[in-house]
Amino acid sequence: ILEAEADTITDFVSGNDLLDLVSISGDNLGTYVEANGAANDFAAYTANATTSFSGNAIDIYVEYNLNGAGNTYFIADEDKSGNVSAGDTLIILSGLSSADAIDSSDII
């Protein structure tokens, strides 16, 4: 998956908005991992996401403030491959740079 192919959300509000993956995939969600990405570029982000994916469920990996640019990156292993790949969903939450930018309860 390429960074340029990501969907971008500019007005996401944690606690008010939801990312609905279950109705799209018809499957249950797996683990949710969140980390500070201030020191990471996109390659490091995807490597960290792959490390966190089990390959058995739709696992989710989030890094806030990726590369210190003030955006939160969200990826879901929708194809359950255990790797970041073209079958996954990548979303950039623009302007959200802190740990409270998104919570696991925002994902259904």
Give, region by region, the residue ranges found by the protein language model.
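Acidic glycine/aspartate-rich repeat arrays in secreted/surface proteins
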Residues: 1-108
